[in-house]
């Protein structure tokens, strides 16, 4: 069955290594299309995105002639008016009750000085009672607004944090959560539905991952009988478990 495209949304996920596009198929009802672009090293993220948009099969094929006529003078895509864009820059989690929109950029740039030339966006994550502050490159924003009428940014880690918080309930043991992706570990802990700890570490080798996890474990005063939850794409999974089990009794793999 053919659908009538109107104010359709495409989801774009930008990581260190890939750009992915996910969108509803405008011809086959109920079908979702997915496409991945591998980042080219040596060029900026915005340049990679511009190339990915130019090559994206979804954007080329999902067209609506009846709308193209009405938007002939528009620079924006004739079918996908809006884009939800997940970006993977460092997060600064601010308690919702302490959030100050005017102070947010200064606070973020103080902690993440390498992003001082980027815009800072704040996205509420009400499920864990925080506002996530994160950087969005000005060039990246420009490339996106050239193609889409409306662009909504989201932190890549937001849905992961919400899911981890859900898993944190139940039982009397403390839980530490680790999300592996793109040669990085995001490590977080919760207590009574609030963020207790959240940080990210770059890792390329299993010993590095073990070191950072155990360092956080010790810093938080966690016991051998507490619970470590692992998720994501884990390189050297068995070797990692072997080392961690020397110090941590309860290790769980969870799917998010």
Predicted regions and their residues:
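Short active-site oxyanion
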Residues: 9, 128-131, 227-229
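Accessory, usually C-terminal, subdomains that scaffold auxiliary metal cofactors
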Residues: 196-256
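A general structural motif
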Residues: 7, 80-82, 173, 224-227
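Active-site neighborhood for divalent-cation/phosphate handling
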Residues: 24, 30-63, 70, 74-166
């Amino acid at each position: 069955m053919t659908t009538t495209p109107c104010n359709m949304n495409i989801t774009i996920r930008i990581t260190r290594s890939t750009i992915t596009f996910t969108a509803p198929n405008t011809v086959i009802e109920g079908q979702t299309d997915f496409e991945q672009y591998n980042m080219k090293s040596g060029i900026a993220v915005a340049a990679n995105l511009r190339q990915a948009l130019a090559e994206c099969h979804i954007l080329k094929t999902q067209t609506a002639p009846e709308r193209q006529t009405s938007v002939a003078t528009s620079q924006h895509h004739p079918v996908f008016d809006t884009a939800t864009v997940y970006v993977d820059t460092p997060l600064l989690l601010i308690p919702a009750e302490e959030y100050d929109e005017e102070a947010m950029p200064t606070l973020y740039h103080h902690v993440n000085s390498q992003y001082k030339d980027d815009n800072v966006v704040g996205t509420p994550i009400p499920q864990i009672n925080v506002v996530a502050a994160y950087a969005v490159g000005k060039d990246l924003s420009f490339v996106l607004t050239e193609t889409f009428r409306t662009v909504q940014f989201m932190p890549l880690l937001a849905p992961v944090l919400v899911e981890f918080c859900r898993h944190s309930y139940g039982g009397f043991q403390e839980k530490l959560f680790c999300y592996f992706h793109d040669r990085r570990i995001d490590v977080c802990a919760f207590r009574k539905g609030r963020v207790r700890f959240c940080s990210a570490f770059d890792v390329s080798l299993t010993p590095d991952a073990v070191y950072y996890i155990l360092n956080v474990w010790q810093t938080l005063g966690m016991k051998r009988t507490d619970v470590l939850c692992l998720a994501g794409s884990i390189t050297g999974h068995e070797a990692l478990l072997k080392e961690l089990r020397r110090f941590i009794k309860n290790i769980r793999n969870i799917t998010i």
